[in-house]
């Protein structure tokens, strides 16, 4: 079936345009920064020019690198394992108490998926992703007793292992968050980061200050009443964590690859409509950022955007044809304040989002929406966005194929990542399996002490490869029979392609007002 003339023109424009290098905005800043530190666009020193401005290559003909890869490939050492972890040494009394209390906890909960429990310091259950609510009181009681036994000794319990499970604990007064996971190669730090994200999800609906004030005045208050409206988002987040979604795993965003001139056109449109009360405006499609303009000194964190996208794209609360105006806390930006969010879906999967610090400017935001939506419609940009997203999602961009089955590139410079679309021909190999592999590889690379490391691991019929540097992490999956020399050649081929397409794959500048 021949494509329509409209889609043909879009396809021709998308595929045949040369890559344009966009200039740096004078007032631009990094879009996202994992450390949530306000910073200007990074400068590149002469010594760091090769690392930061281009992607280095592995040299397969250099003997020491080839030997290094060969040694790694035949290394039989066990992978990173989670072990018992307490912030300070525990006394015998605390250990004995734990042994007595462990029998009260049903660890069958975590045989297949990770279980998350949240309860107040008074022992009242707040949330869990357990289907059978009847087991919560005994579980919560045992866990609270274990945690309290360490608090009495002025020690902080962070994680411990028992039977075939790992238990991690995050204390966020007045809440305790607990994760129960099957024994896994994921580190305790990785599991704690999941609990921290769950805590941030709670704060999106009720600020830390409001929660503390409520419990100070009414110590036995049932917090479920306070965060009840957030429960559907917590459940969805638990599902995504169990599916190893890449955004929370990497603490980075995945922008939609676009020609830089097209992205600039959209950004300039948003920049023309910036009322005084506006903090930021951005367009997103299917949970991927298209473009953004923001106030000069405002820095948004990947996790804050992820939690906002979660509520917009993964639930039915906002994904409709209505306009929505709701207060949302961005916990990493400020856990004690709300930003008022205006959201409107331009079509089923494409949303326009504006944020303001003022609650009474709905009609001002509505006026901006009307102007932006009309111009996007007049230029045919919405259809072009939909086409670009569909092509990127369904068309694998893999210069290393067929040697390399799939890859993930994470840019530390931009706090963004790119991974190509993938069609799964093997029934037992799906998106969750793929993401779980990347989660394990990233977790191990993240906890390496040196800034440069190479790791190759054979797992059944797969060869798993990680290359971590100060500026990027690269993970890929190949056939276990692939030689190291062939693998290196194809890794370099992919990295050269990423270097050429960098301004298309990543948002390198963002406009400020």
Curated annotation (Swiss-Prot):
Residue ranges crossing the lipid bilayer per the database entry: none
Region (Disordered): 1-26
Pfam families xrefs: Fuz_longin_1, Fuz_longin_2, Fuz_longin_3
Membrane topology: Peripheral membrane protein
Superkingdom per UniProt: Eukaryota
Record family assignment: Belongs to the MON1/SAND family.
BP GO terms, sorted: autophagy; protein targeting to vacuole; vesicle-mediated transport
Name recorded for this polypeptide: Vacuolar fusion protein mon1
């Amino acid at each position: 079936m021949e494509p329509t003339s409209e889609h043909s023109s879009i396809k021709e424009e998308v595929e045949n345009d040369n890559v344009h290098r966009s200039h740096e905005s004078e007032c631009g800043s990094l879009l996202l920064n994992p450390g949530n530190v306000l910073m200007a666009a990074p400068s590149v020193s002469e010594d760091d020019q090769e690392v930061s401005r281009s992607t280095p290559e592995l040299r397969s003909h250099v003997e020491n690198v080839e030997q290094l890869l060969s040694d790694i490939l035949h290394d039989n050492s066990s992978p990173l394992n989670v072990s018992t972890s307490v912030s300070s040494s525990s006394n015998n009394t605390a250990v004995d108490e734990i042994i007595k209390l462990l029998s009260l906890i049903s660890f069958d909960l975590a045989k297949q998926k990770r279980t998350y429990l949240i309860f107040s310091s008074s022992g009242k259950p707040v949330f869990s992703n357990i289907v059978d609510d009847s087991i919560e009181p005994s579980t919560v009681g045992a866990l609270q007793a274990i945690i309290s036994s360490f608090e009495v000794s002025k020690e902080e319990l962070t994680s411990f292992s028992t039977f075939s499970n790992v238990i991690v604990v995050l204390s966020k007064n007045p809440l305790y968050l607990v994760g129960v996971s099957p024994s896994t190669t994921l580190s305790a730090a990785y599991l704690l980061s999941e609990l921290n994200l769950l805590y941030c999800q709670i704060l999106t609906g009720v600020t830390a200050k409001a929660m503390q004030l409520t419990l100070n005045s009414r110590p036995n208050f049932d917090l479920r009443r306070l965060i009840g409206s957030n429960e559907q988002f917590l459940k969805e987040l638990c599902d995504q964590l169990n599916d190893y979604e890449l955004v929370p795993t990497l603490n980075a965003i995945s922008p939609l690859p676009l020609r830089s001139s097209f992205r600039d056109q959209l950004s300039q449109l948003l920049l023309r409509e910036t009322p005084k009360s506006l903090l930021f405006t951005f367009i997103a499609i299917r949970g991927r950022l298209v473009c953004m303009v923001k106030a000069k000194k405002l820095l948004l964190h990947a996790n804050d955007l992820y939690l906002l996208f979660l509520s917009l794209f993964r639930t039915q609360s906002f994904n409709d044809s209505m306009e929505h105006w709701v207060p949302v806390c961005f916990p990493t930006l400020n856990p004690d304040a709300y930003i008022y969010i205006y959201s409107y879906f331009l079509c089923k999967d494409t949303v326009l989002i504006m944020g303001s610090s003022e609650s009474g400017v709905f009609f001002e935001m509505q006026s901006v929406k009307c102007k932006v939506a009309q111009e996007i419609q007049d230029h045919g940009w919405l259809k072009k966005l939909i086409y670009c997203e569909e092509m990127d999602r369904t068309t694998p961009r893999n210069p290393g194929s067929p040697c390399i089955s799939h890859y993930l590139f994470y840019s530390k410079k931009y706090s963004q990542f790119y991974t190509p679309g993938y069609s799964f021909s093997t029934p037992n190999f799906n998106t969750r399996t793929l993401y779980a592999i990347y989660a394990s590889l990233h977790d191990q690379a993240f906890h390496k002490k040196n800034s440069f490391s190479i790791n190759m691991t054979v797992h059944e019929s797969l060869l798993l490869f990680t290359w971590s540097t100060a500026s990027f992490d690269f993970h890929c999956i190949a056939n276990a029979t692939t030689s190291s020399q062939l693998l290196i050649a194809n890794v370099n081929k992919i990295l050269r392609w990423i270097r050429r397409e960098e301004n298309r794959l990543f948002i390198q500048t963002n406009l400020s007002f």
